[in-house]
Amino acid sequence: MNEIWKKNREKLLARMEMFSAAVLFAGKAPIKRGDENYPFSPDRNFYYVTGIEREDCILFLAKTRTGVEETLYIPRDNGVMAKWVGANMTAEEATAVSGIENIGWIDAFEEDFATYLFRSGIKKIWLDMENREWHGERTPALRFAEKVHCHAPQMVIGDLYPLFSDMRLIKEEWELERMRKAMDITRLGIEAMMRTAKPNQKEYEIEAAYDYTLMVN
């Protein structure tokens, strides 16, 4: 499966200029209340080139005359948090899923990035700048763009979103298969609601049948 993500990274790198780098963020689950978060869903463009579905991960890609560099940054394991939310992904697991051999720790990303930036001759940084909320919370990419402008104002910022839109416009066969499967599961969910619906039933009771069908399929 990781050949899919490798191919997608190759397609992205082919659209990037020489002496440019890309940084993509998986994102983080929004806080619901107290110590409870909403379910996490990775940034879809990050997932498209990594296959990783864990939060707080960063993908770094660079393209120079010496070749291509790929590094996936993941959180360190935390024994205390592991008891509450489970263990973090290991470096071996991250490589197995993504096909990326070079795995770093997320807390070392900014120092690694700064070191690479000033020794490699990189002239452009690509970030996924999609943002649909003027007054909403800024995305990790927008916050990182501000840091780049602050510490390296000469750097050009490119927007990855149009590149991904072009790449993902025509679906690969594996994507079509997943879409067909999603439609089949949705149909099963609707049929489950129809079978369980009764007079005077609450909406959440009917919804439960739909949600259960999706979870078990």
Residue ranges and their predicted role:
Residues W174-N217:
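Active-site pocket-lining segments that scaffold enzyme catalytic pockets across diverse folds
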Residues M1-L188:
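A composition/biophysics-driven feature that prefers long, compositionally simple stretches
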